[in-house]
Design a protein with these regions (language model features):
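Residue-level signal for functionally critical sites in structured catalytic/ligand-binding pockets
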Residues: 2-9, 40-41, 61, 159-161
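N-terminal single-pass transmembrane signal-anchor helix
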Residues: 2-33
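Aromatic side chains
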Residues: 9, 32-35, 95, 126
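Extracellular/lumenal glycan-associated surfaces
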Residues: 34-37, 144
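Membrane-proximal N-terminal amphipathic helix
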Residues: 37-66
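Periplasmic/extracellular, small/polar-rich flexible segments of pilin-like filament-forming proteins
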Residues: 57-161
Length: 161
């Protein structure tokens, strides 16, 4: 009598492997989704801090009179669509890739009062000065990090040292 030698995997073994791969894929997909959303939140916080830091630097330049193109808030920071010492037209925002400024409300950085955060404006950064008294104001930099939450930093402008 001959014994037949079988090689390969049984159907049960293949089904077990497929089930394990399916479980790993399901767990990995959920983990990746959380990773992406947390990365976007961190990107907005980093961008808000960077813009606030740039405003602080420009405020120092304006106070020192070092840069003739930066003598007050309007010439240093500017508004949507204007040229200024801050030159935010080249600002790169990996979360919101819309063009900065340009006179429309679609840019990655808006020079207007912040609106409620929604899915449509998640990733947008709003730069809003309070009412000026002379050339002194508080500038709020707010970033919508998700559809329902935001991160903001307030920066003094023109108060002097």
């Amino acid at each position: 009598m001959h014994k037949s030698l079988q090689s390969g995997f049984s159907l049960i073994e293949l089904l077990v492997v497929v089930a394990i791969i399916g479980i790993l894929a399901a767990v990995g997909t959920v983990g990746y989704g959380n990773y992406v959303s947390q990365t976007k939140v961190k990107a907005v916080k980093t961008n808000v801090d960077a813009v606030a830091g740039a405003i602080n630097t420009l405020e120092g330049l304006a106070q020192a009179g070092v840069d003739p193109a930066c003598s007050n808030y309007t010439t240093c920071i500017g508004t949507s669509g204007s040229t200024s010492a801050m030159n935010l037209a080249n600002f790169k925002n990996p979360y919101n890739t819309s063009t900065t400024g340009g006179g429309t409300a679609t840019g990655a950085i808006q020079f207007q009062a912040a609106v409620a955060c929604t899915a449509a404006n998640a990733g947008t950064i709003y730069v809003t000065p309070s009412a000026f008294v002379g050339d002194v104001a508080t500038v709020t930099v707010l970033g919508c990090d998700t559809a329902s939450s935001s991160y903001n930093v307030s920066v003094g402008w023109g108060a002097g040292p």
